[in-house]
Every structure is written in structure tokens, then in C-alpha cells.
Curated annotation (Swiss-Prot):
NCBIfam families the record matches: acpS, pantethn_trn
Keyword annotations from UniProtKB, A to Z: Cytoplasm, Fatty acid biosynthesis, Fatty acid metabolism, Lipid biosynthesis, Lipid metabolism, Magnesium, Metal-binding, Transferase
Binding site for Mg(2+): 8, 58
Coiled-coil annotated residue ranges, if any: none
This enzyme's EC code(s): 2.7.8.7
InterPro entries the UniProt entry points to: 4-PPantetheinyl_Trfase_dom, 4-PPantetheinyl_Trfase_dom_sf, ACPS, Ppantetheine-prot_Trfase_dom
Gene that this polypeptide is encoded by: acpS
Name this protein carries in UniProt: Holo-[acyl-carrier-protein] synthase
Catalyzed reactions: apo-[ACP] + CoA = holo-[ACP] + adenosine 3',5'-bisphosphate + H(+)
Any one Gene Ontology cellular component term annotated for this protein: cytoplasm
Family that this chain belongs to: Belongs to the P-Pant transferase superfamily. AcpS family.
Organism: Latilactobacillus sakei subsp. sakei (strain 23K)
Gene Ontology biological process: fatty acid biosynthetic process
One Pfam entry name: ACPS
Length: 117
């Protein structure tokens, strides 16, 4: 049974401005593992990655029912399986977590579905 659904849309340029304003922005938003992956990218691809990971964190917090203020950014980690499918590693929700992530040239969208039973 679906117990939560969250969607977030992020403008990639907003993350470029945040990085320019604070060079440690990515370190604050990403987990250590996510930051390690982020550091392998440059330019626009790095910004897409950062915006995507943030959007997943936001979407998860909405699905969880608390919003981002109650879920620490470091508590939700998005990784990819060997086929490239994103998945969320977290200890907050006891159930199945589904995640979908997509990009355009200017936007990132993330959807998270929380399921039990």
C-alpha cells in the first residue's frame, strides 16, 4: 500500500548560484558518498547531479510527510544500482522506497513513493 508520495522540481541554475555564493554548498547538501560521486563530475553535469540529489531529498521529505525542515539532508542518500537506477539509502522509513529522477536542460524532477505491506 502506498503511504507517501513526494515530488520536487528543481531549477539547475539555482544550484549554480548557490555554489558560486558558497563553495561548500554541495558539502552541506550531499552525504559523504554523494559528495565523492559529485566530485567526479564537472560543469553542467555536476550541477545536474547536485540538483537531482537535492530534489530527491525534498521529494522524500514530502512523501515522509514532514517536509525538508524535519528531515536532515544527510539522512537521505541517493545512489545508483549497477544498471543506473537511482535508489535511496536511509534509516527513516521502514518499508519500500521507490525513486524516479529525470533532467531537462534547465530542470530536474524527482518523485518518491513510500510503500508498506
Amino acid at each position: 500500500m502506498i503511504v507517501g508520495l513526494g515530488i520536487d522540481l528543481a531549477e539547475i541554475d539555482r544550484f549554480e548560484k548557490a555554489q558560486e555564493k558558497n563553495s561548500r554548498f554541495a558539502e552541506k547538501v550531499l552525504t559523504a558518498t554523494e559528495f565523492e560521486l559529485f566530485s567526479h563530475y564537472t560543469g553542467r553535469r555536476a550541477l545536474e547531479f547536485l540538483a537531482g540529489r537535492f530534489a530527491v531529498k525534498e521529494a522524500f521529505s514530502k512523501a515522509y510527510g514532514t517536509g525538508i525542515g524535519q528531515v536532515k539532508l544527510q539522512a537521505v542518500e541517493t545512489l545508483n544500482d549497477p544498471q543506473g537506477k537511482p535508489y535511496i539509502k536511509q534509516d527513516l522509513f521502514d518499508g519500500v522506497v521507490h525513486v524516479s529522477l529525470s533532467h531537462t536542460a534547465t530542470l530536474v524532477i524527482a518523485e518518491v513513493i513510500l510503500e508498506r505491506g
